[in-house]
């Protein structure tokens, strides 16, 4: 299936499309606050279009936790018939490019249902690693456990390592 993949802004005019996509793609339902927040994150939320049809979306937020600036991928998904066409890759690359241009993010992370092997494989291709598994993360879906996948964006500078070596001598 050949086609044109484009990313578009999420606006009050198309937020209902995002809601419908999320209802179909994800086993979890998102509340009104989720969608209100999505309208305020700018480039961190995008609808994905395949030949002008909305088929997927990515929604992220900036998270300041663990004394770090982190990007949290709340949702990234695509309708089943449109998977493996490069749409997820385009959405993830968009988010990674934002982080790279910004230059101040320590890492990017997300939760994935432990049974979702295709998602886990997808993120691993981009350098994400499973850093922990949260028991009973999801309510009302099975399996309820989620892996936390993370990609580190900051490489510790050589100067820091040199200091550590000096103090050991």
Swiss-Prot record:
Residues 5-154 form the N-acetyltransferase domain. It is an enzyme of class 2 (transferase). Residues 137-140 are annotated as: Substrate. Keywords: Acyltransferase, Cytoplasm, Nucleus, Transferase. Substrate binds at residues 30, 74. Coiled coil: none annotated. It is found in: Cytoplasm; Nucleus. The active site is at 72, 111. It comes from the Eukaryota. GO terms for molecular function: histone H4 acetyltransferase activity; protein N-terminal-methionine acetyltransferase activity; protein-lysine-acetyltransferase activity; protein-N-terminal amino-acid acetyltransferase activity. CoA binds at residues 78-89, 116-125. Its EC number is 2.3.1.258, 2.3.1.-. N-alpha-acetyltransferase that acetylates the N-terminus of proteins that retain their initiating methionine. Has a broad substrate specificity: able to acetylate the initiator methionine of most peptides, except for those with a proline in second position. Also displays N-epsilon-acetyltransferase activity by mediating acetylation of the side chain of specific lysines on proteins. The relevance of N-epsilon-acetyltransferase activity is however unclear. Required for sister chromatid cohesion during mitosis by promoting binding of CDCA5/sororin to cohesin. GO terms for cellular component: cytoplasm; cytosol; nucleus. Signal peptide: none annotated. The gene is naa50. Its main location: cytoplasm. Acetyl-CoA binds at residues 76-89. Transmembrane segments: none annotated. This is N-alpha-acetyltransferase 50. Belongs to the acetyltransferase family. GNAT subfamily. PANTHER family: N-ALPHA-ACETYLTRANSFERASE (PTHR42919), N-ALPHA-ACETYLTRANSFERASE 50 (PTHR42919:SF41). One of its GO terms (biological process) is establishment of mitotic sister chromatid cohesion. It catalyses: N-terminal L-methionyl-L-alanyl-[protein] + acetyl-CoA = N-terminal N(alpha)-acetyl-L-methionyl-L-alanyl-[protein] + CoA + H(+); N-terminal L-methionyl-L-seryl-[protein] + acetyl-CoA = N-terminal N(alpha)-acetyl-L-methionyl-L-seryl-[protein] + CoA + H(+); N-terminal L-methionyl-L-valyl-[protein] + acetyl-CoA = N-terminal N(alpha)-acetyl-L-methionyl-L-valyl-[protein] + CoA + H(+); N-terminal L-methionyl-L-threonyl-[protein] + acetyl-CoA = N-terminal N(alpha)-acetyl-L-methionyl-L-threonyl-[protein] + CoA + H(+).
């Amino acid at each position: 299936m050949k086609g044109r993949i484009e990313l578009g802004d999420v606006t009050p005019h198309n937020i209902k499309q995002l809601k419908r996509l999320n209802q179909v793609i994800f086993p979890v339902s998102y509340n009104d606050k989720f969608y209100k927040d999505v309208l305020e994150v700018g480039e961190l939320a995008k609808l994905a279009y395949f030949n002008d049809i909305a088929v997927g979306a990515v929604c992220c937020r900036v998270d300041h936790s663990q004394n770090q600036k982190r990007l949290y991928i709340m949702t990234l998904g695509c309708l089943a018939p449109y998977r493996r066409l490069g749409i997820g890759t385009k959405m993830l690359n968009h988010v990674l490019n934002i982080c790279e241009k910004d230059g101040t993010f320590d890492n990017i992370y997300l939760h994935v249902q432990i049974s979702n092997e295709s998602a886990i494989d997808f993120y691993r291709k981009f350098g994400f690693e499973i850093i922990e598994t949260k028991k009973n993360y999801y309510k009302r879906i099975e399996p309820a456990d989620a892996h936390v996948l993370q990609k580190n964006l900051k490489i510790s500078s050589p100067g820091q390592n040199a200091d550590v070596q000096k103090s050991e001598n």
